[in-house]
């Protein structure tokens, strides 16, 4: 069993009852997030790239909880220099952790950090395929549509079906609803949760319309979560 809690934007918490894994913990400055960063606990934090709405509060949370940050090698190294534990990986790489397995997947986006007048390049952006609590979860990060998504079921899950896809639909900075629908068809997940929309005016979308199209044109269940909602994955499935 795996509990998946949405905090708005691309911010999620995975909890199997033993370990808590945060993904892209954007709390401070997130206008739709219902809680503050100091209200969450985590054992691990996955960060898809260095932009402020994804790196977010990762370093502060890691300092407060002792959590280990998992990200690209360059971004993990940046976090280590800030005084926290971090494990660096590269796209295509996978590693087993006490809670399960993490694989870094390709994402088409940027990954820079602005500090004052300085721009820091912190490697490539990524997504994550997480196997945890007997379930498989794909967090796409910020990305445009890419055929690399076809590899999730074909190769990485060895023909098994993906349990849950967390896909951006906001457009402008990544996939919009049309491309997210194509991604859903390629990934063929049991369930999909749209993310990275309606946080700011530039990424406003009609999520109800997106859910209708996914329901009509695929056999994936589309779950629209309000910030603070939790989706529980249980029963059969990889």
Swiss-Prot record:
The keyword Hydrolase applies. This is UPF0173 metal-dependent hydrolase Helmi_16730. It comes from the Bacteria. It holds the Pfam family Lactamase_B_2. Disulfide bonds: none annotated. GO terms for molecular function: hydrolase activity. The keyword Hydrolase applies. SUPFAM superfamilies: Metallo-hydrolase/oxidoreductase. Coiled coil: none annotated. Belongs to the UPF0173 family. Keywords: Hydrolase. It comes from Heliobacterium modesticaldum (strain ATCC 51547 / Ice1). InterPro entries: Metallo-B-lactamas, RibonucZ/Hydroxyglut_hydro, UPF0173, UPF0173_UPF0282_UlaG_hydrolase.
């Amino acid at each position: 069993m795996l509990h998946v809690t949405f905090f708005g934007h691309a911010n999620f918490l995975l909890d199997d009852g033993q370990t808590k894994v945060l993904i892209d913990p954007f709390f401070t400055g997130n206008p739709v997030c219902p809680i503050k960063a100091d209200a969450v606990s985590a054992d691990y934090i996955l960060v898809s790239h260095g932009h402020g709405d994804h790196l977010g509060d990762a370093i502060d949370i890691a300092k407060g909880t002792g959590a280990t940050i998992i990200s690209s090698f360059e971004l993990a190294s940046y976090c280590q220099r800030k005084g926290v534990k971090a494990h660096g990986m590269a796209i295509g790489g996978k590693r087993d952790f006490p809670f399960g397995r993490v694989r870094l997947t390709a994402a088409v986006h940027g990954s820079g950090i602005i500090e004052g007048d300085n721009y820091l390049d912190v490697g490539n952006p990524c997504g994550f395929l997480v196997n945890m609590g007997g379930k498989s979860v794909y967090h796409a990060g910020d990305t445009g549509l890419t055929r690399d998504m076809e590899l999730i079921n074909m190769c990485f899950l060895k023909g098994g079906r993906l349990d849950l896809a967390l896909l951006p639909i906001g457009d402008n900075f990544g996939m919009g609803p049309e491309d997210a629908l194509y991604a859903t068809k390629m990934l063929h997940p049991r369930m999909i949760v749209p993310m990275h929309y309606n946080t700011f005016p530039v990424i406003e979308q009609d999520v109800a319309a997106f859910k209708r199209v996914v329901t009509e044109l695929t056999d994936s269940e589309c779950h629209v979560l309000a910030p603070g909602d939790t989706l529980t994955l249980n029963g059969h499935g990889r």
